[in-house]
Design a protein with these regions (language model features):
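Hydrophobic structural segments characteristic of membrane proteins
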Residues: 31, 36, 104-165
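Alpha-helical membrane-protein architecture signal
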Residues: 3-7, 53, 85-89, 104, ...
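Short, glycine-rich, amphipathic interfacial segments at transmembrane boundaries or analogous
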Residues: 39-88, 146-164
Length: 165
C-alpha cells in the first residue's frame, strides 16, 4: 500500500471519528425535513472507474417545484451547467454548502479508497465530456475532497480554469 493511501486511510478514519457528532446531527436534521440525508452521484475516479460520491442532501427534488420553475432550471442548467441561486437548494442546504459541511460524507469515499483527501474535484461524465483530451490527465489521479481549485477561489474560478488545474 502506498504511503498516500495509508495516510488517507488513517486520516479519514480519525476525521470521521472526530466529526461524527456533526455527521449524525446533520443527518438527523435533513431526515426531519423529509429528505434522505445522503445524496449519491456517479463520479469518475482513478483510471476512469465510476463510483458513488457521497454528500449531504442540500436540495429538494426538482419534481416538488412548479413546472415553470422546473423548465427554467433545466434550461439554465443545460446552458450554463450550474445555477447561481438555485431554487432547489434548501435553507439548511445553503448553510451546509457555504460551510462545506455537505462534503463531510466524502470522508467515507476516502476511507473506501474512491477518493483521496487531496486531489482534483470528482467530476461527472457530463463534465468529463467537456474535458476533451485533457480527461486522460484527470483519470491518472484519484479525485480529492480538497485540491488546488478549492484553495484558488472555489466557485469564483471559471470552469475552463478549473479544468486546467
Amino acid at each position: 500500500m502506498k504511503s498516500k493511501r495509508i495516510f488517507d486511510l488513517c486520516a479519514s478514519l480519525l476525521l470521521i471519528l472526530m466529526v461524527s457528532p456533526v455527521l449524525i446531527g446533520v443527518a438527523i436534521i435533513i431526515s426531519l425535513s423529509g429528505h434522505p440525508p445522503i445524496y449519491r452521484s456517479k463520479r469518475i475516479g482513478l483510471n476512469g472507474c465510476m463510483f458513488n460520491c457521497y454528500k449531504f442532501t442540500s436540495m429538494k427534488d426538482i419534481s416538488t417545484l412548479p413546472i415553470e420553475i422546473q423548465n427554467n432550471i433545466l434550461k439554465e442548467l443545460h446552458a450554463k451547467g450550474h445555477m447561481k441561486n438555485d431554487p432547489r437548494v434548501t435553507k439548511f442546504g445553503k448553510w451546509i454548502r457555504k460551510t462545506s459541511i455537505d462534503e463531510l460524507p466524502q470522508l467515507f469515499n476516502v476511507l473506501f479508497g474512491n477518493m483521496s483527501l487531496v486531489g482534483p474535484r470528482p467530476i461527472s461524465q457530463y463534465e468529463a465530456d467537456k474535458y476533451g483530451k485533457k480527461i486522460e490527465y484527470y483519470k491518472k489521479s484519484t479525485p480529492g475532497i480538497t485540491g488546488i481549485w478549492q484553495v484558488s477561489g472555489r466557485d469564483e474560478v471559471k470552469y475552463k480554469r478549473r479544468v486546467a488545474m
